[in-house]
Amino acid sequence: MWLIFSPIKQHRMSLAIQKATELGVSKIIPCITEYTNIRTINTKNLYFNAIEAAEQSERLDIPKIEKQIDLRSLLLKWPEDRKLVYCDEKINNGKSIIETLTPLKDSSIKWGVLIGPEGGFSDLENELIAKTKNVVAVSLGDRVLRSDTAITVSLFCVQELLAK
């Protein structure tokens, strides 16, 4: 499972990387969006957070942390053999995340989870994401979550519902 997220404040980002590592993410990709507030990140610090979390959770590997990439480039290069769970508070398809994801359970499918910046994605970005192949749009509920909370919740749901 991959995590794609918009960079956030250092303390919250460190916490998000720790939780993502504990939840078994294999790759972490910082993604710059229109509303991203933090434009430069220290990937070395993120790597150290991942090492610490891997040790704590008795994980034998450490997720690969990619260089940051802009959303458009990420979507243009998105692998055809991997689905992208797109989490956004504006999605209202009348279904819960469980109802949306459970029918997609297939152990051969590879997954990525996309979490946007605080403030969400721009209208243009929402259109771009919606037009991308293999995107599964989900809502994480009625409440607007902080990015680090949304990362933990979404990864747990995908892992429990799909990745087993």
Where are these regions (language model features)?
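RNA substrate-binding interface of SAM-dependent RNA methyltransferases
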Residues: 1-86
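Short, solvent-exposed amphipathic alpha-helical segments in soluble enzyme
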Residues: 19-23, 101-104, 128-131, 154-155
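A C-terminal functional module that forms or caps the active site or interfaces directly
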Residues: 108-128
